């Protein structure tokens, strides 16, 4: 408060039984109201006075004057609606109690729903109160009470929910005489009470607040003439009890600033930064109010949004993270339970980024001269939080926005050419209109902090984002700002990059900083280069590399070295030949019972020739074609080959049609040693039972390589993550650090979250070999070079979104349907747009239920990620008639026919409200339709009076008639008493 006298706040509350709903909401609201008022530092002391009536054990009670808000909370929580034997209450006693304790200028908020005792409503408690007050030398006359309040500098603002003259006239008289206003609430829910009271007090302080729906001001229908009133009984029609009454009307509420309370709330920003006790108070209030039921109280003035932004900027205070977590929980809760409030809070957070007050002040006070100045020549504008993404991610989209701004800057030399702004005008939220120029005479500190204000009005960067902005201006060679940017970067060299901040570990920021090493210290360069490699490793999991691998045959006709078996005289592959006791070649098929045990020999030639293991239960019959009589099905230079899945040796196959199990050579299947030889070109191994080539293995070239070396190589496209998983130690030695073993390296982790788990190696090595599927890559050196190129660049291979045809890092593309037969991929936004097109209550887009390319239903995990609700509809396997439009029913949650296409050329507009015919015909028992023609929702009455409020459209109506809707509860009660004689007449069906 700006050098004003002390001002106190008194809150007077009717706590009788009729205030049940009102007081229940009020007790919650008061806790929010007193905390919000406390952080304005305008009100010095607060006192809450509760009153009932003279038939109750407790007529009045008070919290006493307190300056510490925590001392009020127990009293507020103890407020209960009780007692009150007749309609009027002991309001005059409460007013006298107030007069007894007031010491300073006082603002009074008076909540009530009933009049004070008066001869027009006199019953038993009337006599009790008049006797008590007169006997105690107190004031009983209402008009005299109002005059005394005014004389004592007490201004009263009644807040009531009754429009009847018999009630409202007393409070209109009180507010008129004391200089206040009477506020009429159309609804007494917590939200309306809190919003109205806080906005009332903030308006008195000088904040521009618009009172929208839910509250009106009550005024006399003619000009108030105090001199015509003698007392409460001779009241000239301003109060009940006379033959003619002056009407009480409702008008739109407008509250002017009061000189007692006028203050500049913006000064509290500097207090937050300078006073630790005040900062503690702000944190405590935000923590208390950060709940779904009370967070709206923070949204009624932009100063509270500024406090939220200050809290979010406080990096070294653990309370910030607690509040941010609370806010996340609140937003998630409101998103599910109260969409309207969720929108309000989201907009409030958005407003918290707008610092137009501060920016305008910097331009006016820190600039030596207005010109030369920078202005923006563009039609594109952004929100402050959009441009502030520059501080968080430095991604391409945000950087392009900044470049767009810098390229649209113009230099103005003459003051008369500057954009004109009415500095006295305020926007819809009470903020000044932003100035649209930035003087170049501002010091660099301010120039680069408020420069984004041109494209995102209200933007005011802290040091870090302003340094990033200067970096972009320098890199893009902006002729107006390059020299200033260079000076700014040189001045802060080594002073602004805090390695404890998560934002400094993002890939975009790292890559940007390494473009200007001249403005980094040696330590910072080493820091960024190291984490650029870490980032490069993390993002390249989906990058594809071309690798050359030794070919893997499976029932494939290949070149072969063959020799004649000296027993059967068939030309056999060298992989099937053994040496008998006489030193002659003997193929596996020629082994006979005469040579060895029958079972063993059966297994020998069975395995070698057709790979069918005897132990699997498959037996060799006596009339089998296996054995020496088995003829070769290939010529003398070719055989059908397999690769053993255990030892990876190649071996030939004779009876191909008998092969029906996993390939395994004889040695691996029976765990015996079998000689083999390795090709010096393709590195494939071959079974060599007779050791024909094993003795000269250093010069062995396999038959496939002899014929055509290119045919012995399979060229594969393999994802980097598959190579990494099989060569971890090798790749770690190449890059110089080890990634943590307990995480999925390519699972989308941020660098900051794993940086403490990264083990930096003392030295790096230069291995030249890599394996894939247990075989050595033939082009390992080239693959290593390609891998390191991607890792060291801090960038990843891009792929094409097959829906929007934009390029994205492959790690940011997903399979559209998840089926192996469909390899189509798309970006997140396109996936969300495609599968998210169908919404409950709207027209069903049948195509969006399937993959846009293969036309199959997507896998559950894909669909659930982008539209979980639609999973149930897809699972029902509905067949859709192409001649019909279908809608998604709000009630049965099933696709239902809407109209034939031949009857409706254009798609029907369902507006999210589609209910199928079957569901529409089902109504709850004893229900009545809302009489609002635009609503018509079925409503059930479950006890209480006959005043009803539709929860859908908020209209009021009489349950007995249910044929007319009213705007207010007051109109409904007027109808009930006039037509039905009261609010509780029973319907014959009830």
Curated annotation (Swiss-Prot):
Residues that bind Zn(2+) 2: 930, 935, 950, 953
Positions annotated as zinc finger (IBR-type): 855-903
List of residues binding Zn(2+) 1: 801, 804, 827, 830
Active site (UniProt): 945
Annotated GO MF terms: protein serine/threonine kinase activity; zinc ion binding
Any one Pfam family match given in the protein's UniProt record, by short name: IBR_1
Annotated protein name in UniProt: Putative ariadne-like RING finger protein R811
Organism lineage string: Viruses, Varidnaviria, Bamfordvirae, Nucleocytoviricota, Megaviricetes
